[in-house]
Amino acid sequence: MTTKAIYPGTFDPLTNGHLDLLTRAARLFDHVVLAIAASPSKNTLFTLDERVALANDATQHLSNVEVIGFSDLMVHFAQQQKANILVRGLRAVADFEYELQLAKMNHHLMPTLESVFLMPSEEWSFISSSLVKEVARHGGDVTHFLPDAIVRALLEKLH
């Protein structure tokens, strides 16, 4: 049986922490969809098309990863993709309550969808897209936290 997993998020922008989880998910599952959510309720810095393009560039080296933008309910997207696994990251205890609620709701809506939680490597356990954008807005060096092309795109957007 082929395992197809979805790793969903806004990825505004995709960080090295996200790439760490994605790379590990790509080793665990036959096919992984990096599902980039439109997230109209969030005030994203990058458009959905820009986030998809940046993620495609950053994931070229992962042959079993496909980047797709979506605006559906996650379970509807999972059904369309014929995926049975949802990959989520847990950085800290604070993430757990929210992720537990999401997992329970997703399982209620689609009982065949299993949530699998991965913890980031220690090096990336404290970063988030929001934090990286905030540091960059104030002139801090974010080169360690983002792929090179995304650093350039972020700095162009902010300045």
UniProtKB/Swiss-Prot annotation:
GO terms for biological process: coenzyme A biosynthetic process. Its EC number is 2.7.7.3. ATP binds at T10, F11, H18, G89, L90, R91, E99, W124, S125, F126, I127, S128, S129, S130. The keyword Transferase applies. One of its GO terms (cellular component) is cytoplasm. Its cofactor is Mg(2+). The record marks H18 as: Transition state stabilizer. Substrate binds at T10, K42, M74, R88. InterPro entries: Cyt_trans-like (IPR004821), PPAT (IPR001980), Rossmann-like_a/b/a_fold (IPR014729). It catalyses: (R)-4'-phosphopantetheine + ATP + H(+) = 3'-dephospho-CoA + diphosphate. It is an enzyme of class 2 (transferase). It is found in: Cytoplasm. Reversibly transfers an adenylyl group from ATP to 4'-phosphopantetheine, yielding dephospho-CoA (dPCoA) and pyrophosphate. Belongs to the bacterial CoaD family. Homohexamer. This is Phosphopantetheine adenylyltransferase. The lineage of its organism: Bacteria, Pseudomonadati, Pseudomonadota, Gammaproteobacteria, Enterobacterales. The gene is coaD.
